[in-house]
Amino acid sequence: MSQQLKIIVGSKNPVKINAAKHIFTMYFPECIIDCEGVNAPSGVPDQPIGADETRIGAQNRVNYCKKHHHAHYYVAMEGGAEQFSYGAATFAYVVIDNALNQVVGRSSNLPLPQVLYNALLKGEELGDVMDKAFNTTNVKQKGGAIGLLTNNHATRESTYTQALTLAMAPFLHPELYGQTN
């Protein structure tokens, strides 16, 4: 009989739930993966600006999940944006926690058109900005800005999946990550 692995995701967004389920199914093929999304407050603005605000949002979601739910792993993803010296970009922070260790990872950057980033600075969420620019509906629960700007060669889910895949490394090799010398 297969062991069941309970995963709590700090969001009800199907893109985030699917990304988490994908990586746990990949890393634990012998297990039955029970992946549930829950509403978890980020404690940051709906559209985080800057790396720190984005990371803190993901960590807050995971910490809320740990406090209010019981699971083998807790996962959160938070999308943010920032103005860099080379231009505006969007990215995500991911956090995975198994009650013993908490690992923070980050996705790659997607360059953002300056006009779209400026709308974020005025308080709009990226999903809403993209829906207006591309005449779409609720793109944040589909391919996201990433899908729209890459002509669907990458998507919000594929980007979360890659970041989560990399963030799992310390859980897979704890003997190496626990060493300091």
Predicted feature descriptions by range:
Residues 2-71:
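N-terminal polybasic phosphate/anion-binding patch
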Residues 46-181:
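Anionic-ligand binding patches
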